């Protein structure tokens, strides 16, 4: 069986393995999640779907579909504050929170609600369906093709 190796410059993004081994997510959604995580600590970057779509080849529709997939799976919470008159603030002022594991969703959403946010994400997955994995058990016994 061949080995995988990496040589790089040292700049990296930490991503929990849970998202990679979630068989319910498409590669598109996993890629979008990782790209977002790579940008999170850039204080000058303001997340908008259109702005994010300029960074990738797939375009606004594909990004929107991938984000909806991540939201419904519980890896992203989209939240927005309301103004004093009850209207939502501009889309540019929305808050997007990435989660390492969908099991965190309920607690984080509750914290956001306490802070005055409205939760806009449509989380459809039962957290009990999230599968804990062991790395050695996630691969076929004969290794991988390739």
What are these language model-derived features?
Residues 1-10:
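N-terminal leader segment of winged-helix/HTH proteins
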Residues 6, 27, 62, 82, ...:
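Compositionally biased, low-complexity repeat tracts
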Residues 9, 80-83, 89, 127, ...:
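Small/flexible residues
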Residues 10, 50, 61, 103-106:
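Generic alpha-helical secondary structure signal
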Residues 11-18:
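Short amphipathic alpha-helical segments and their helix-coil junctions
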Residues 19-30, 35-93:
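Winged helix-turn-helix DNA-binding recognition segment
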Residues 95-146:
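Charged low-complexity intrinsically disordered patches
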